A protein has these predicted regions:
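Transmembrane-cytosolic junction motif
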Residues: 31, 74-99
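Membrane-interface amphipathic/juxtamembrane segments adjacent to transmembrane helices
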Residues: 6-12, 87-108, 112
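Cytosolic juxtamembrane N-terminal segments of multi-pass membrane proteins
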Residues: 1-35
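Short hydrophobic alpha-helical membrane-anchoring segments
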Residues: 45, 49-57, 75-82
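Hydrophobic alpha-helical transmembrane segments
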Residues: 53-72
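Transmembrane alpha-helical segments and their cytosolic interface motifs
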Residues: 31-47
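Mixed-charge, low-complexity intrinsically disordered segments
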Residues: 162-188
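Charged, low-complexity intrinsically disordered regions
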Residues: 101, 105-108, 117-161, 186-339
């Protein structure tokens, strides 16, 4: 697979010109809106000054009018500032989507990216890790990739439950000497898992489900309730690799087959993957060779929302870091597929 050095060489030769042209188009829209806002504020200021000149006495009415105009001027200035700030973030987001897709195009001609699409709930449920009967599921940034005839997909995932909350509003009526209490009911979202779902196939076929669940104090302490929402089945299996047992709990109904699947080579590959992407992960090895990896606190959305300082130009370092994060995802398939 092409690496960061190849991409930066491509950037210097061709891509810089292509990206700069796309950024310039968005810049024109931003500065056009900025000019309109500046013109509006100048007009407000001129009207403000003229009113002071025309009604420049010291009457209470005039002072009140000036005060109200000052509030109006400050309010419009604040609103316009927020509008511009939101537009800057939106432009940064749009540029990052362009960069994301251009990096995918550089790495492969066979990919699909749909920003507002999630993995079908039926396919997600088939991995059998989280219990979707009691969890709500949302997803976005669906990406399917084919590199060297190896197909895999990933998308952002949010799994959450809700609980009813009650907000009380109290009002005391002195005339009737009565305390009125109104209860407002609303649902509070409780996130259980937020991260990336990654699905691929490995050459080594499995005969039964095997689950790897993170096994350390921090995971249990921070997500002590997550086990209530995991629906995997099987018996806990102790492997001969003590270090691996300390990292992951292994569950399966077939101890012999799970030991065959989790060979020393595959465990080394999982350790290599953990070094590449340090976020905690849940692994599901299915019977047909499919593997589902749930990577906690890692999303494409966070990557796309990172501000890129487009007004001063997209730096080579920013592009290199962006490329690394995407190539790490695409290398998961390369690392984990044991021949």
């Amino acid at each position: 697979m092409k690496n960061k050095k190849d991409f930066l060489l491509y950037y210097q030769k061709e891509y810089k010109m292509i990206l700069d042209r796309k950024v310039d188009e968005l810049k024109k829209e931003y500065y056009k809106k900025l000019k309109v806002i500046i013109l509006e504020q100048v007009m407000y200021f001129i009207v403000f000054v003229l009113l002071i000149i025309l009604f420049g006495d010291n009457s209470i009415l005039t002072l009140l009018l000036i005060f109200l105009l000052m509030i109006l001027f400050g309010f419009t200035l604040f609103i316009n500032y927020k509008l511009l700030d939101n537009q800057k973030k939106d432009i940064s987001y749009q540029i990052n989507i362009v960069i994301y897709q251009d990096i995918l195009s550089f790495l492969t001609n066979d990919y699909l990216y749909e920003e507002n699409t999630q993995l079908a709930i039926e396919d997600f449920n088939k991995m059998g890790l989280f219990n979707l009967d009691i969890l709500n599921y949302e997803g976005c940034n669906f990406t399917g990739v084919n590199i060297d005839n190896k197909r895999f997909l990933y998308c952002d995932v949010l799994l959450y439950t809700t609980r009813e909350k009650i907000l009380q509003d109290k009002y005391y009526d002195e005339s009737d000497d009565i305390l009125y209490i109104t209860n407002y009911h609303y649902d509070e979202e409780i996130p259980i898992f937020k991260g990336l779902y990654y699905e691929m196939n490995i050459s080594k076929k499995n005969k039964d489900y095997v689950y790897l669940i993170p096994n350390n104090f921090n995971d249990k302490f921070i997500n002590k309730n997550i086990y209530h929402y995991i629906s995997f089945k099987g018996n806990k299996i102790e492997l001969e690799n003590i270090a691996f047992n300390e990292k992951y709990q292994v569950y399966s109904f077939n101890e012999l087959k799970s030991r065959y699947l989790l060979s020393l080579t595959l465990m080394e590959k999982i350790n290599e993957l953990d070094k590449l992407v340090s976020n905690k992960k849940y692994y599901v090895f299915k019977k047909d060779g499919r593997v589902g990896i749930f990577i906690n606190d890692f999303t494409i959305d966070n990557l796309l929302k990172k501000e890129n300082n487009w007004q001063k130009g997209i730096s080579e370092k920013y592009l290199g870091d962006f490329f690394n994060k995407i190539s790490y995802l695409l290398r998961i398939n390369e690392i984990l597929d044991e021949k």
